[in-house]
Structures are given as C-alpha cells and as structure tokens.
Regions:
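Conserved catalytic core of two-metal-ion nucleotidyltransferases
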Residues: 97
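Histidine/lysine/aspartate-rich catalytic loop segments that bind and position anionic ligands
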Residues: 156
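Glyoxalase I/VOC metalloenzyme domain signal
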Residues: 1-6, 10-32, 42-86, 100-153, ...
C-alpha cells in the first residue's frame, strides 16, 4: 500500500540560485547540501534541486503542488502577488495559486484545513507527469497501488491518488496556468513493502533496482519512482 510522498527531485542548472529563490519566496530551509544537489524541506517532503549529471535526473518543466494552511492562504497570495503574475483556481471550496520558478517549473500552493500549529509549506500533495501513452501509464500506476479518482482521458489527463498523495498523468498538453507535466521526473513514495509492490509492475518497468532507500523503478516513460520502506 502506497502512502505519502518522500521527495521530488527537479533538475536545475544552478542549485544554489534556485535554493535562494525557494528560500526567498517559499521560506524553504536547506536540509542537506551534497555534490550537485541541495535538499530543501518542503514541509514533510524533500524538494531536491539537482544539477545535470548522472541518472536519475530531476524533472524538467514539472508542475507540482504544495499545501499551505487555509488560514495563511490569503497572506501567501498577497506576498507572492507582489512579485508574480499569479493564476488562481478554485477546486470545490479549496483555492490554489500558481506561479513559475526560474527553471520553468509551475509551482502550485493549495490551501488545506490543517492543524492550528501548522505554518508555511507543509508538504507535497500533487505531482504531474507527462506520459506518451496515457492508457498504459494509468494501468502501470494502478498496478503500483494508485487509485484513479478522476478519469479525464478525453482531455488527456487522469488523476490518481494514494489517499495522501495525488499523481496526475498527462498526455503532452498545457494545463491550468499553461503548466506541463514533468519529463524524467524522480520522486519517492512511502510504502509498507517495497519489494512486494515492485513485483506488481516488474514485467513492464524499464528497470527495477534495489537501493538504500528501498526499490527504485523506472516506468515506461522514463520517470523514476522509488518505493521507500
């Protein structure tokens, strides 16, 4: 059974410059700096800023969404609106704002009713992957443990979830705020039994590799998902 997201990696030319950007505008602290990569704390999720180099690479032009407390949403909107041409969209009773980082990633901040002590960015709640064959990609991620909750294949998009983390699979297209799904994205998801889950997709995966964190799978579109035990 899949659970919450552990990390999202983005490929960036200069990690130090993007670190400064995310510090200035989203107040994300540095957890770790290593050769060619800086790890930021996006609440409970790691945001890994990775320079071009070895595989797995980080995602390019990746749309992803972070949660903020609903009590702080208006403050974030006002603060970011001074610097960015924001796009806003409402999903039911929840509002989201969209802006771009210097590398062309579309960042979404979505309000959520969170505990009173929660403040700032609290975690990753959505990630969008670009895929070549939507039907096959949906089947792959359903067998991995995601559940389809919004089937918009006619529009070129399908939304799946673990219950704690949403994954959108898009055919090449533009979404809200002209966002795109990421290519060669690298992300981690928590699960109780990485090896057992990996066996469900082993025949169709491009590779399945045991790593320190768990089991790393390369899907048919070249995205890497690590099942973290």
């Amino acid at each position: 059974m899949l659970s919450s997201p552990e990390w999202l990696a983005l490929e960036v030319k200069y990690p130090d410059r993007l670190t400064a950007f995310y510090d200035a505008f989203l107040e994300l602290d540095v957890l770790e700096e290593r050769d060619g990569e800086t790890v930021l704390a996006a609440g409970e999720t790691e945001l890994r800023l990775r320079a071009p180099g070895d595989v797995p690479r980080g995602g390019l032009h990746t749309h992803y969404a972070l949660t903020v407390p609903d009590s702080e949403y208006d403050d974030w909107h006002d603060q970011l609106g001074e610097r960015f041409d924001l796009v806003e969209h409402t999903f039911g009773d929840a509002r989201s704002l969209y802006f771009y980082d210097p590398e062309g990633n579309c960042v979404e901040l979505g309000e959520r009713p969170l505990k009173a002590q929660s403040s700032g960015v609290t975690g990753l709640f959505e990630l969008v992957l670009e895929v070549e064959q939507l039907d096959g990609a949906v089947e792959f991620y359903e067998r991995l443990g995601f559940e389809t909750v919004d089937d918009g294949r006619e529009e070129g998009r399908v939304r799946l979830t673990t219950g704690k983390f949403d994954l959108e699979l898009w055919s090449p297209r533009l979404g809200i705020a002209d966002a795109r799904g990421g290519v060669h994205v690298d992300f981690g998801v928590v699960t109780d039994d990485p090896s057992s889950v990996a066996r469900e997709v082993a025949d169709d995966a491009l590779s399945v590799t045991s790593v320190k964190d768990g089991v790393r799978i390369r899907d048919p579109d070249g995205h890497y998902v690590t099942l973290v035990g």
